[in-house]
Amino acid sequence: MRKESPPPLVPPAAREWNLPPNAPACMERQLEAARYRSDGSLLLGASSLSGRCWAGSLWFFKDPSAAPNEGFCSAGVQTEAGVADLTWVGDKGILVASDSGAVELWELDENETLIVSKFCKYEHDDIVSTVTVLSSGTQAVSGSKDFCIKIWDLAQQMSLNSYRAHAGQVTCVAASPHRETVFLSCSEDSRILLWDTRCPKPASQMGCNASGYLPTSLAWHPQQSEIFVFGDENGSVSLVDTKNASCTLSSAVHSQCVTRLVFSPHSVPFLASLSEDCSLAVLDSSFSEVFRSRAHRDFVRDATWSPLNHSLLTTVGWDHQVIHHVVPLEPLPAPGPDSVVE
């Protein structure tokens, strides 16, 4: 039986409790988002989804093993509402999708001990569910439960275009890592759209969702520019070739909705799949399962691969856990009755 062996942690006694200025005293329970920076620092987005006020916060940890302990963060800030999604903009900027309907840009300042607001734009009419930065680094895309997708100029701090191409709530947008004008979107209208902002009619429908289940998550293949994957509400993960809009591979990975898909930085990348069944699955290029963890006790919401250790995958969830998984890089033996990590 293969056990998870998390990276060694620094004993609490060896660390100094030092809550930075302006950081909230307490982190909300539901962890929604996690992103490693290129130097191995970890960014977290948290939300409180119960009670009279839906609050949120951002947290920056130079030592990821200390997360989610507030006293050992390097910077933190309270947000007006819950954090639905976030992503890095370079090494300093933080783009946030807010439950308030705002798209927010924050920035690390003061030797990375402060997170300061650069702009906050209320241009969506409902929760902003998803954000992504185009590969140019100067423009971003937001998707909302108001059915709209907006293109943003980050330097000018303004929206450039607004599209109502979907007939349902937008669940995910994903920028192509290969082409700076191309991204994907999916929605509760069951459709997946391929976008190219250079075109007069920028959206084209991908006829790849034959199952009829609602697509919930998208991710581009990091090396093959025409390939992407999507997850659906039924727990299946499918691989699509945009050249012919066909689904070339599909697997029933989870028993409930897929919440996030994240490719690894390996030369032959693994795919991390997260779900509301509280599990993490890691798949190889043929969609064979190489790793499974059920360590979370609530919905698993996000995952991020370490840029410094390619076998290290960090997940967060609504159980307030930040779990560091060591994914085997060598082939696993044939699965037996005890092969699932609990």
From Swiss-Prot:
Xref: InterPro entries: Methylosome_Comp_WDR77 (IPR052139), WD40/YVTN_repeat-like_dom_sf (IPR015943), WD40_repeat_CS (IPR019775), WD40_repeat_dom_sf (IPR036322), WD40_rpt (IPR001680)
Recorded GO CC terms: Cul4B-RING E3 ubiquitin ligase complex; cytoplasm; cytosol; Golgi apparatus; methylosome; nucleoplasm; nucleus
PROSITE patterns reported for this sequence: WD_REPEATS_1, WD_REPEATS_2, WD_REPEATS_REGION
WD repeat residues: 22-75, 78-116, 123-162, 165-205, 209-250, 253-293, 295-330
Keyword match Repeat: yes
Localization: Nucleus; Cytoplasm
GO BP annotation list: epithelial cell proliferation involved in prostate gland development; negative regulation of cell population proliferation; negative regulation of epithelial cell proliferation involved in prostate gland development; oocyte axis specification; positive regulation of cell population proliferation; protein polyubiquitination; regulation of transcription by RNA polymerase II; secretory columnal luminar epithelial cell differentiation involved in prostate glandular acinus development
Modified residues (Phosphoserine): 5
Keywords, comma-separated and alphabetical: Cytoplasm, Nucleus, Phosphoprotein, Repeat, Ubl conjugation pathway, WD repeat
Major localisation: nucleus
An example Gene Ontology molecular-function term: methyl-CpG binding
Subunit structure: Component of the methylosome complex composed of PRMT5, WDR77 and CLNS1A. Found in a complex composed of PRMT5, WDR77 and RIOK1. RIOK1 and CLNS1A bound directly to PRMT5 at the same binding site, in a mutually exclusive manner, which allows the recruitment of distinct methylation substrates, such as nucleolin/NCL and Sm proteins, respectively. Found in a complex wit the component of the methylosome, PRMT5, CLNS1A, WDR77, PRMT1 and ERH. Directly interacts with PRMT5, as well as with several Sm proteins, including SNRPB and SNRPD2 and, more weakly, SNRPD3 and SNRPE.
Functional summary from the UniProt entry: Non-catalytic component of the methylosome complex, composed of PRMT5, WDR77 and CLNS1A, which modifies specific arginines to dimethylarginines in several spliceosomal Sm proteins and histones. This modification targets Sm proteins to the survival of motor neurons (SMN) complex for assembly into small nuclear ribonucleoprotein core particles. Might play a role in transcription regulation.
PANTHER family cross-referenced by the UniProt entry: METHYLOSOME PROTEIN 50, METHYLOSOME PROTEIN WDR77
Protein name: Methylosome protein WDR77
Taxonomic path: Eukaryota, Metazoa, Chordata, Craniata, Vertebrata
